[in-house]
Amino acid sequence: MALVPYEETTEFGLQKFHKPLATFSFANHTIQIRQDWRHLGVAAVVWDAAIVLSTYLEMGAVELRGRSAVELGAGTGLVGIVAALLGAHVTITDRKVALEFLKSNVQANLPPHIQTKTVVKELTWGQNLGSFSPGEFDLILGADIIYLEETFTDLLQTLEHLCSNHSVILLACRIRYERDNNFLAMLERQFTVRKVHYDPEKDVHIYEAQKRNQKEDL
């Protein structure tokens, strides 16, 4: 849910974005996410990919308790909030312009004892990566962040920096255009990639990626 243009073709699809609150139930909590389509656009609404990825995390598909996780292009922060409620130590990131809105959702939905293990931090892909330790996170999460082709190289550089050989990347997305497949092809040059989930109702895929080790490349 990064700050990118987005095409929504149906009137019904747009209506849900104009609601000031989107309410969800995850991890035995009611989560109320503020939305602000009119003023902040795509970064301030909940996209289907975030819902599907949050559901996948709640299913227990990956171990979260006690693990370090980062959400990229977090937008409203739903995925990071769910990961924190499920026990992860989460860093929730987006560009500077989105941070105050993101913080408001995190503070409204996480109990104080979980907020102490959760960080909201600026991250523009490909920039100032030195503020993050190489291979810092066990789990890297992204929902609907594969979109603008001109960001692909920076996103790959960011993933490469944040991942260790043991890190797991989970990317939730719709495959709308050829450029989406192009990104997956670029990802496969540096990572082992497999599809682990598909939601037919929302037409959202989840891909898991891990760094290729040297033995695989020989």
Curated annotation (Swiss-Prot):
Gene Ontology CC entries for this record: cytosol; nucleoplasm; protein-containing complex
Residues annotated to bind S-adenosyl-L-methionine: W47, G73, A74, G75, D94, W125, A143
Catalytic reactions on record: L-lysyl-[protein] + 3 S-adenosyl-L-methionine = N(6),N(6),N(6)-trimethyl-L-lysyl-[protein] + 3 S-adenosyl-L-homocysteine + 3 H(+)
Location(s) in or outside the cell: Cytoplasm
Keyword set includes S-adenosyl-L-methionine: yes
Annotated transmembrane regions: none
EC top class, as a word: transferase
Entry similarity comment: Belongs to the methyltransferase superfamily. METTL21 family.
Name of the protein this chain belongs to: Protein N-lysine methyltransferase METTL21A
The organism of origin for this protein: Homo sapiens
Lineage: Eukaryota, Metazoa, Chordata, Craniata, Vertebrata
